[in-house]
Swiss-Prot record:
Location(s), subcellular: Cell membrane
The entry's keywords: Cell membrane, Ion transport, Membrane, Nickel, Nickel transport, Transmembrane, Transmembrane helix, Transport
Bilayer topology term: Multi-pass membrane protein
Family of the protein in this entry: Belongs to the CbiQ family.
Protein's name according to its UniProt entry: Nickel permease LarQ
Main location: membrane
Gene: larQ
Any one Gene Ontology BP term: nickel cation transport
Induction comment: Induced by L-lactate but not by a racemic mixture of DL-lactate. Makes part of the larR(MN)QO operon.
Keyword Metal-binding found: no
Subunit structure of this chain's protein: May form an energy-coupling factor (ECF) transporter complex composed of an ATP-binding protein (A component, LarO), a transmembrane protein (T component, LarQ) and a fused possible substrate-capture protein (S component, LarMN) of unknown stoichiometry.
Disruption phenotype: Deletion of both larO and larQ leads to a loss of lactate racemase activity. Addition of Ni(2+) (but not Co(2+)) restores lactate racemase activity in this mutant.
Transmembrane segments: 64-84, 117-137, 159-179, 210-230, 251-271
Biological role: Probable transmembrane component of the energy-coupling factor (ECF) transporter complex LarMNQO involved in nickel import.
Native species: Lactiplantibacillus plantarum (strain ATCC BAA-793 / NCIMB 8826 / WCFS1)
Amino acid sequence: MKPTRPNTDIPAWLQTTTTTPTPAIKAKFWQRNQRHLRQLLSRLAQPAPVTATSHWRVAPQFKLIQLLLLVILIALSNNLILLWSLALLVGCQLLWLPPRQLRRFMGSWLISVGMAMLFVLPSYWLAGPTTLLFFGLKTSLMLANAQYYRLTTPFQDLLAGLKALHCPDLLIMTLAIAITYLRMLGQHLLLTMEALELRTVAPTAHPYRLIGALFGNLYLKSYTYALELYAAMEARGFNGHYVRSTGRRTHWRDYLALSPAIIVWILFIFWRH
């Protein structure tokens, strides 16, 4: 009797491929935060070009003084006419911006105003809608001036302005290191989130507790970076003081750029008396 050959054919129901439609779900906790972090890192890697708002270059310290004068004046003034004139001054400065930079200014300014209004909102129940609108107007003007300065001033000019105003070297060094290593810490946070996503097999039960652990790890990493950087700077002979380079001489155009803020301050002083 010959041995029978076993039947090795695969059944037909195993050969048919069935595709199960997967319902569209919302973005997960990891993916959503990683997308926002990648967008932030791309902006830090390729910052937007600074807009030239005038035909001559104003000294960095004069631009910084103008910003401080306007912000302090907005904080001290309670006159609606004076605040309206300051709003017109900012509006006239915005007219010199290109359309692309103006759209970027409006987007960042509206987001910052919306976040600031969350802190001003309790005044509605304490003092009424009039106080809320008044403080909202002052906060919006402060943020508009700060946003305009950020849009038209590179970071190196900010450091040069602080040096020209004789700010402490420790403050300038801390600010420069913080901006320089911000992208490095962001990349470390992104890599940590990707590693946790690969090791996570279930939905995150406590996302806010996990966020606290991530930022705690980020703080320890920044502390390690700071110690390594300080040791490297000491090895290269840094003694905590910057060599002050000879800056350019002040010109009458610098004082002319500062004149609108001075005129508004004079009106504010004489209006009160």
